[in-house]
């Protein structure tokens, strides 16, 4: 069902007309049918919300998820409200049965997982005891060789049982916590990181124009975070940025490009003025003056350059390299969270099932910080303001606080940065790259059970060729030589920006003593 309903927005704007769409058990809303291509402004799951009819206003109905979401709606007439109530109630009833079955299966799997975890702890204790016994036998010498053989056999048997139980834990976890639970995009909404594949061409454009169109981050009226951007425009924008790093093959025609903080581009020729900032036309005239060893036409950087192949990192909706720090190195909250969302799909390319726990942890922490942000967007414009607010309120160390969520979020981002750095530096073994990154970042914060789960996940890591192929926008691009150069170029932009912002957060947490040695 679809149609126009009035939604209460705030005390300033009051009731505003919105176009609602009920499909697949999800009620989503848009500014208008014509703006549906931009993606929904908000949505609510009918299976988990309460439908309340207003006691006085016979055109009003409220959809509520206690403590999370509140949709206050009004129809244009009593009859229209009745039609919506029937449709919403039917959708909720149809979903309840299947939801109950899924919850039952989820509970059973959770209980089985707890049982297996208890067995793991038991086997761990046995391993410790048997290792101590082995040490004693080894220290005593080889007087009784049979006893040494028996101890070794018993230790091997316990190790095999431990590994088998750990694998069963992973199988149960994979069955119960699939990656499909992480994102539920409302019908009609564009996917976050899906771009149309098209052959890249070099556009002839005025280079003095701004190369970056601001990405509009629309925080939904009900608190969800979404990114709105036109796919073709965004791909074109990223292509322009990438093209600035091409070099002309003509002799003595080296033209370098770099982005200013305001998004404009400065082109440097051989005869640049000392201030280094002139427009393209003046440089072309300088390069063409008599006395130069060679003459380049303005079009030469485009005509003679090699093919530019877009990668996952050059076509991200929002990137850490796009973020401009505010006053006192303030990290803008909305842009940072959107950049975090944009990098999460890297885990899907490593393995959507085995890395689901890591992905769920990252997404969960992003949502916790966002929930704090939307409570007061005017005040919490930077991450530092959120942390300092909780420090002053003495809730920074409270479990599930935004400060704690940001702590684990930056740890997860450090792991991803470490892994991508290994790949950029030429590591061809994905398992080795992951293991090195894990050892430098997350391992010290994990107990033996989580370390074992990660070790098991490493065994399912893809090959280098498969991982690189997953980072392409157009199938088969990874086989081209220009793709490797493109990856190096994009990561050289992306990783330093990411590292700079993580370093700022590290300093903030160190100053206020917010780092934790807690092991999970």
Curated annotation (Swiss-Prot):
Residues 255-268 have a biased composition (Polar residues). Residues 311-520 are annotated as: Glycolipid transfer protein homology domain. The modification Phosphoserine is found at residue 145. It is found in: Golgi apparatus, trans-Golgi network membrane; Membrane. One of its GO terms (molecular function) is ceramide binding. The PH domain of FAPPS binds the small GTPase ARF1 and phosphatidylinositol-4-phosphate (PtdIns4P) with high selectivity, and is required for recruitment of FAPPs to the trans-Golgi network (TGN). This is Pleckstrin homology domain-containing family A member 8. It comes from Rattus norvegicus. The lineage of its organism: Eukaryota, Metazoa, Chordata, Craniata, Vertebrata. The gene is Plekha8.
């Amino acid at each position: 069902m679809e149609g126009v309903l009035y939604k209460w927005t705030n005390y300033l704007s009051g009731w505003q007309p919105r176009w609602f769409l009920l499909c697949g058990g999800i009620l989503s809303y848009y500014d208008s049918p014509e703006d549906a291509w931009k993606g929904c402004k908000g949505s609510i799951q009918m299976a988990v919300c309460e439908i309340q009819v207003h006691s006085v206003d016979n055109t009003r109905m409220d959809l509520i998820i206690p403590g999370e979401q509140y949709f206050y709606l009004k129809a244009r007439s009593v009859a229209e409200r009745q039609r919506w109530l029937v449709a919403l109630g039917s959708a909720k009833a149809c979903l309840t049965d299947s939801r109950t079955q899924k919850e039952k299966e989820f509970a059973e799997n959770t209980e089985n997982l707890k049982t297996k975890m208890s067995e793991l702890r038991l086997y761990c204790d046995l391993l410790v005891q048997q290792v101590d016994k082995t040490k004693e036998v080894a220290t005593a010498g080889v007087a009784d060789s049979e006893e040494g053989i028996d101890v070794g056999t018993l230790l091997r048997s316990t190790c095999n049982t431990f590994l088998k139980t750990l694998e069963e834990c992973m199988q149960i976890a994979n069955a119960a916590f699939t990656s499909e639970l992480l994102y539920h995009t409302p019908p009609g909404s564009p996917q976050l990181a899906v771009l149309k594949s098209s052959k890249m061409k070099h556009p002839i454009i005025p280079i003095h124009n701004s190369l970056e169109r601001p990405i509009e981050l629309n925080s939904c009226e009900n608190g969800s975070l979404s990114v709105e951007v036109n796919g073709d425009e965004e791909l074109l924008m990223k292509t322009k940025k990438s093209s600035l790093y091409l070099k002309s093959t003509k002799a003595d025609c080296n033209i370098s490009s770099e982005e200013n903080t305001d998004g404009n581009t400065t082109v440097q020729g051989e005869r640049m003025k000392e201030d280094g900032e002139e427009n393209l036309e003046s440089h072309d005239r300088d390069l063409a003056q008599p006395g130069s060893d060679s003459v380049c036409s303005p079009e030469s950087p485009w005509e003679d350059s090699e093919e530019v192949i877009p990668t996952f990192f050059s076509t991200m909706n929002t990137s850490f390299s796009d973020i401009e720090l505010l006053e006192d190195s303030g990290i803008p909250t909305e842009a940072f969270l959107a950049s975090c969302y944009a990098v999460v799909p890297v885990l899907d390319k490593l393995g959507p099932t085995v890395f689901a726990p890591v992905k769920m942890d990252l997404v969960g922490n992003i949502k916790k910080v966002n929930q704090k942000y939307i409570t007061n967007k005017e005040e919490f414009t930077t991450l530092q303001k959120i942390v300092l607010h909780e420090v002053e309120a003495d809730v920074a160390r409270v479990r599930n606080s935004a400060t704690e969520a940001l702590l684990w979020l930056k740890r997860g981002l450090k792991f991803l940065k470490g892994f991508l750095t290994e790949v950029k530096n030429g590591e061809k073994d994905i398992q080795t790259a992951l293991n090195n990154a894990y050892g430098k970042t997350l391992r010290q914060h994990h107990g033996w059970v989580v370390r074992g789960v990660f070790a098991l996940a490493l065994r399912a890591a893809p090959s280098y060729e498969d991982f690189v192929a997953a980072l392409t926008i157009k199938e088969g691009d990874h086989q081209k030589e220009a793709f490797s150069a493109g990856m190096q170029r994009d990561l050289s932009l992306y990783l330093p920006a990411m590292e700079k912002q993580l370093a700022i957060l590290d300093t903030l947490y160190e100053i206020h003593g917010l780092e934790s040695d807690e092991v999970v």
